[in-house]
Structure formats: structure tokens, C-alpha cells
């Protein structure tokens, strides 16, 4: 069976519709969405309504959670004060625009979804704000997959697609026992995969094209899809609706405008 997995639509209705047409062209039997339906872009209600109407299996993203709770992410979730300021502007705008029925839909989205040997999350199994970057320490990456009790972990959040295979390996770890003494344990970790599906509506891989993944559950083949769409329409709408112009520039470039946080695994506990 072929499935399509997408993430980070970010209120970009033009990109979503183009990706859905591409999915249909490739005869995928099921669609999964890894959250962040809203935020940054100009069409939050249209995007949520489309996902609802198609009954797409969806998990919550960090933006979806924040809009439901009516909160901004705290400052330590942003790599800079400028990024925080822009993020809060987008949050406040989206919070005012979102319709009650769409907010209710976002509120009931689960953090994690499992099906067969596959797990689906937005950021990581631990937090929607954690980035599973391709250069993440192999042991940490493996632990994240093992925590889901799956073989393939699909994620988004970084807006940059990649496939990482964690080869089978014999591992030795030290665990503190009840008496406080460390004990050595060994186990064999089977082959696992992390598949980051990129972003439909706000790509950051250096091009403005929407990205998503097609996965064959029979052959385990992963196909990273990059789809052209008329991003100029979304760029124009961002400006017309009064959102920060930098969002339009970033969308047109397919680039991040701010520096990355020093610790991508850091999650605020406040």
C-alpha cells in the first residue's frame, strides 16, 4: 500500500491543494498529516476545513496546540527576540481569524498516532517543539524511535525533508539500579528509520516548492516528493492580510530567516 505523509501546511491553501492533486496522481491509498495546519500563512480556516473534509489522519503540531490554548510559545522556543516578535504577530493574527469549529478540530488532535510498524509525530515523540535534525546524535535518534515501539518514525517540524536509516547495532548501556549502583546492559537494536517529510506550506530546503513523502508499506521505499505550485498567490495574500512581510520573503526563497537555536532538543518546561 502506498501512503502519503505531509506536514507543516501553515495556512498555505495553494500549496495544500497542489500537493493533494499530486497525491491523487500517484494513487496513494491513505493520507497522514503531521500537524502545523496553521501559523505564518494567510488561509488558516481554508486549510483546516480541507483537512477536515477529507478526513485526513492528523496529529497536532506546535502551532495547532498554541492556537487551541490561546498562548504564544515562550521566548526560549525562538532562536532570537526578533523571531519571537514575528512569531507572536502571526499567532495573534491566526488566533483572531480561526473559526470556532476549526479551533475545536485542532483541539482534539492527538500528539502521536501509530499504525502497524509506523509512528507519526510532529516534532518528536516527547514534544512537538523538539527538532529531530538529520545530524542528531545517533543514540538519541535511535532512542526517539524505540520510544514509539515502531520501525519507522515519521516527523516534520524542521521544514527540511530527509530520510535517516539507523542501522542494526549491538549497544551497551549503563543503567543505575535500585541500589544506586551502575549496571551494564547490552541489547541489539534493529534497523529503524526516521523520515522527515518536510513542509507543504513553508519549505526551508532552499526552494519554494512544497514537499511531502510517499511511503510504500510493502517495500518500505521512501519517495521524497517536491511539488511546484504558484507560491506568488500565497506571497501576495500574506502581504494583503497584514502579516509580517518577512514571511512572504521566506516563502518565496524557501529559506529560514533566523538563526537556529543552540540546542534543538531543548524543550521549555514553563
Where in this protein do the model-derived segments appear?
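Beta-strand-turn-beta hairpins that frame and shape the catalytic cleft
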Residues: 1-3, 113-120, 188-194
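Active-site neighborhood of phospho(di)ester-bond hydrolases with catalytic His/Asp-centered motifs
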Residues: 6-7, 31-36, 40, 57-62, ...
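Metal-dependent catalytic neighborhoods of phosphoester/phosphodiester hydrolases
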Residues: 37-54, 67-79, 131, 164-166, ...
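Active-site neighborhood of divalent metal-dependent phosphoester bond hydrolases
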Residues: 54-118, 127, 131-149
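Short beta-strand scaffold segments in enzyme catalytic cores
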Residues: 112-114, 161-165, 211-215
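Hydrophobic, aromatic-enriched interface-forming segments
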Residues: 138-139, 143-173
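Acidic, His/Gly-rich catalytic cores of divalent-metal-dependent hydrolytic chemistry
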Residues: 168-270
